[in-house]
């Protein structure tokens, strides 16, 4: 009796490991604990504030959170409304501006994704052809702490 139960348990474990192993192999280049943003693309609240009028703030949070509160002067540009909001953003942006994208917290990936799309799809660069899109370290939570 015990041998049959152990055998069934081992079969169930093996069956559960097959899809997990397949997913690990398929997504091996997308390790979840690896940061999606390089250190050179992250900016602290203090650094972004020091840019003054040369910084353009982009809120990547859902519209409801933006409407409730946001960084003064920030514009909404998120994944949910990307196609509708991108033209508004591009109308306000110029190559002499540094773009600071933020979302709710450090663990939120929305800012990283919006920043990536601005770099790759909208091909934003500064006047010298360098990166001008940054992700705010700590996101909205960090901004609120340092108000």
Question: In which residue ranges do the predicted regions lie?
Answer:
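Signature tryptophan residues that serve as conserved aromatic anchors
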Residues: 33, 140-143
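Active-site neighborhoods of enzymes that stabilize oxyanions during catalysis
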Residues: 146-147
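A short helix-to-beta-strand connector/capping loop
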Residues: 53, 72, 128-132
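Flexible, polar/low-complexity N-terminal or interdomain linker segments that lie immediately upstream
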Residues: 1-68
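Short amphipathic alpha-helix with an adjacent loop that forms part of the alpha/beta core around
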Residues: 47-51, 84-95
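Mid-length scaffold segments of soluble, non-membrane domains
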Residues: 56, 60-78, 92-103
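Catalytic cysteine-centered active loop of the rhodanese-like fold, especially the PTP/DSP P-loop
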Residues: 88-141
């Amino acid at each position: 009796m015990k041998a049959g139960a152990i055998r069934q348990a081992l079969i169930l474990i093996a069956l559960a490991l097959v899809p997990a192993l397949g997913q690990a192999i398929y997504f091996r280049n997308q390790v979840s604990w690896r940061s999606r943003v390089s250190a050179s693309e992250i900016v602290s609240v203090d650094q972004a504030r020091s840019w003054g009028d040369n910084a353009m703030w982009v809120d990547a949070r859902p519209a409801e959170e933006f409407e409730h509160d946001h960084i003064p002067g920030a514009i909404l540009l998120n994944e949910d409304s990307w196609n509708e909001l991108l033209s508004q953003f591009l109308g306000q942006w110029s190559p002499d501006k540094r773009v600071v994208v933020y979302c709710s917290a450090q663990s939120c990936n929305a800012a990283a994704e919006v920043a990536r799309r601005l770099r790759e799809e909208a091909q934003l660069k500064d006047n010298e052809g360098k990166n001008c899109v940054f992700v705010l370290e700590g996101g909205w939570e960090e901004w609120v702490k340092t108000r």
